[in-house]
From Swiss-Prot:
Protein species of origin: Prochlorococcus marinus (strain MIT 9301)
Swiss-Prot/TrEMBL keywords: 4Fe-4S, ATP-binding, Chlorophyll biosynthesis, Iron, Iron-sulfur, Metal-binding, Nucleotide-binding, Oxidoreductase, Photosynthesis
Keyword ATP-binding on entry: yes
Pathway terms, separated by semicolons: Porphyrin-containing compound metabolism; chlorophyll biosynthesis (light-independent)
Lineage: Bacteria, Bacillati, Cyanobacteriota, Cyanophyceae, Synechococcales
Enzyme superclass (EC): oxidoreductase
Name of the gene: chlB
Name assigned to this protein: Light-independent protochlorophyllide reductase subunit B
UniProt cofactor(s): [4Fe-4S] cluster
Length: 523
């Protein structure tokens, strides 16, 4: 067991809550102690929803453990069914309740209800939130469609031609507490409609049990978020022959690949690549003169598997950045992230420890960080611009405006969100350079979000004394003055290289001349 003040994912029952809260006519009875009801806040505070999640907690207390907690479970299940009248009931237990082994799912199935009951057995001590969401969606899909499985009749992706209608697809994976899922769905539906393709069902977001039963009315499935939907897509392919897409339409190239993959599976004519590229401003903006100085900028990426892999491809192939770090907390997608990292000649970081991520960030010395809410905090401490690309996120990353990550408009949003911090960083450096002018004063608040620059900390963000790990290094006044002229987003790297050079040459004091010599040495 590990004690930490931050975690990238909650326990698996939070993933189950995400699926239940995303859907209609479903209720989730969770066998849990009083303290586990905190999860409600994730939906009302971060997602800013106007209603509570459809979850009933048994909320047992310490004094209940001496009695029959199974009766408490049955009482809560009965009351939830009578009050909410769901079409499908999910039953599970939290990490604490798992230790009691009351088997709430088995109890619910023995109560004689005339509705589908999904027994969620989510191992809380070995799995986490995204796996819990994936397993819940998979079990729900399987429960509602298992009676319709036919081993003789498989769904053909060309069936729409025989029926004389437009092709239909399902969009699977978007859920509450996902990163910009609501807007991604709108954007992808718009793109598909432009290609003459209708959307049959979007699930789990906004779907009902009746919609899940209609999944087999479509020709293929769009696996929009692999962490949530891949297991369900595999089951549908195995039992109904339904093909599904593998390309995630984040970025211009991926969106074009996605459209062509859908066309190939449905036997539609392929589209013109140049014509599609003009639908977003990102290609032109990234080629414009104003963006030339962005080429080769060092970027560190960490997030869920879907967004981290897509971000790496956009950074390298569409914006001309140099990816110096890539990682994920999603162990289920570790293989894909490692493969992407290998293509970029970097070592993948697979961890759920934010301190390891921050340490890797320091060593990589990036000029831009793309990550989660925690990487934003770490980047502030290190004085590096950051843009959030993945959950877990803060309420400020759930905008009221239309702000997708996928498709053409998503590419526009990404360009703004990634490039503007770098532009602001350049402006920040100019302010730092000319702060001796009367228009500027020390202590001026930075618009990057971190606190004003403290001249005592300008050389080091995390050390009080200026020491190298091998021996003490003394910076002279001239050396300090010259180092402050270096843009803050590369200052850490310049300082490290200069100290390495000083140790290599046996120089006890670093002056401005030493800094110049070090620059020439490492050039």
């Amino acid at each position: 067991m590990e004690l930490t003040l931050w975690t990238y994912e909650g326990p698996p029952h939070v993933g189950a809550m995400r699926i239940a809260s995303s859907m209609k006519d479903i209720h989730y009875v969770l066998h849990a102690p009083q303290g586990d009801t905190y999860a409600d806040l994730l939906f009302t505070m971060i997602e800013r929803r106007g209603q509570r999640p459809p979850v009933t907690y048994t909320t047992f207390q310490a004094r209940d453990l001496g009695g029959d907690t199974a009766e408490l479970v049955k009482k809560n299940i009965k009351e939830a069914v009578e009050r909410f009248k769901p079409k499908t009931l999910l039953v599970g237990e939290s990490c604490t309740a798992e230790l009691i082994q009351d088997q709430p799912g088995a109890l619910a199935k023995g109560m004689g209800f005339d509705m589908p009951i999904v027994n969620l057995e989510l191992p809380a001590y070995s799995k986490k939130e995204n796996w819990g969401a994936s397993e819940t969606f998979y079990q729900l899909t399987r429960t509602l469609l298992k009676d319709k499985v036919s081993f003789s009749d498989k769904i053909s992706p060309f069936r729409w031609k025989e029926l004389g209608r437009r092709p239909k697809v399902n969009i699977l994976g978007p859920s509450l507490l996902g990163f910009r899922c609501r807007d991604d769905v709108i954007e992808i539906q718009r793109i598909l409609s432009e290609q003459g393709i209708d959307t049959n069902v979007v699930a789990p977001l906004g779907a009902s049990p009746d919609d899940i039963e209609r999944l087999i009315d479509a020709e293929i499935n769009i696996c929009l978020y692999q962490e949530i939907a891949e297991a369900s897509c595999e089951w549908l392919k195995r039992n109904f022959g339904m093909e599904y897409t593998n390309t995630i339409p984040i970025g211009i190239k991926n969106t074009i690949e996605f459209i062509n993959e859908v066309h190939e599976k449905l036997d539609l004519p392929l589209t013109n690549k140049e014509e599609l590229e003009n639908k977003s401003k990102l290609p032109w903006y990234s080629k414009s003169v104003d963006s030339n100085y962005l080429t080769g900028k060092r970027v560190f990426i960490f997030g869920d598997g879907t967004h981290a892999i897509a971000a790496a491809k956009i950074a390298k192939e569409e914006l001309g950045f140099e990816v110096v770090g890539l990682g994920t907390y999603s162990r289920e997608m570790a293989r894909q992230v490692r493969a992407t990292a290998k293509d970029l000649n970097v070592e993948a970081l697979i961890t759920n420890n934010y301190l390891e991520v921050e340490d890797a960030m320091k060593k990589a010395a990036p000029e831009l960080v793309l990550g989660t809410q925690m990487e934003r905090h770490s980047a502030k401490r290190l004085g590096i611009p950051c843009s959030v690309i993945s959950t877990p996120m803060h309420v400020q990353d759930v905008p009221a405006r239309y702000s997708p990550q996928m498709g053409w408009e998503g590419a526009n949003v990404i360009f703004d969100d990634w490039v503007h911090p770098l532009m602001m960083g350049l402006e920040e450096h100019l302010i730092d350079m000319f702060k001796h002018d009367f228009e500027f004063v020390d202590g001026h608040q930075s618009h990057l979000g971190h606190t004003a620059t403290n001249k005592n900390n300008i050389l080091n963000s995390d050390e009080k004394k200026e020491k190298n790990s091998k021996e003490e290094i003394i910076w002279t006044e001239s050396g300090r003055a010259e180092l402050t002229k270096v843009p803050f987003f590369v200052r850490g790297k310049v300082k490290t290289n200069t100290e390495k050079y000083a140790i290599l040459r046996g120089i006890p004091e670093i002056s401005d001349e030493t800094l110049y010599d070090a620059k020439a040495y490492f050039s």
